[in-house]
Amino acid sequence: DPATCEKEAQFVKQELIGQPYTDAVANALQSNPIRVLHPGDMITMEYIASRLNIQVNENNEIISAHCA
């Protein structure tokens, strides 16, 4: 659901930036699918409004989130 994704992207940006991405974080989120983007990952360019993209750094810490 795109509305759920947007709500969760805002939550991640407000509450989880700098936190490690863990199974507990993944299980707490309702968006489906969730794509975790690591530095250097190749990504596909198709737009899926309900997909939550969580960007992490080399230490697996959350640095950004958006829907696409």
Swiss-Prot record:
InterPro entries reported in the protein's UniProt record = Prot_inh_I78
Here the disulfide bonds are C5-C67
Statement: the UniProt record of this protein carries the keyword Disulfide bond: yes
Which Gene3D superfamilies does the UniProt record give? Trypsin Inhibitor V, subunit A (3.30.10.10)
> For this UniProt entry, what is the primary localization, expressed as one broad class?
secreted
Superkingdom of source: Eukaryota
Q: Which GO terms describe its molecular function?
A: serine-type endopeptidase inhibitor activity
Thermal dependence of activity, per record: Stable at temperatures below 80 degrees Celsius.
Report the subcellular localization. Answer: Secreted
Gene Ontology cellular component? extracellular region
Which UniProt keywords are listed?
A: Disulfide bond, Protease inhibitor, Secreted, Serine protease inhibitor
What is the pH dependence described in this protein's record?
Stable from pH 6 to 10.
More details:
On the 2D-gel the determined pI of this protein is: 7.4.
Job description of the protein: Elastase inhibitor. Inhibitor of A.flavus elastase with a Ki of 40 nM. Inhibitor of A.fumigatus elastase and human leukocyte elastase. Inhibits the fibrinogenase and collagenase activities of A.flavus elastase. Does not inhibit porcine pancreatic elastase, trypsin, chymotrypsin, thrombin or A.acutus AC1-proteinase.
Q: What is this protein called?
A: Elastase inhibitor AFLEI
Species of the source: Aspergillus flavus
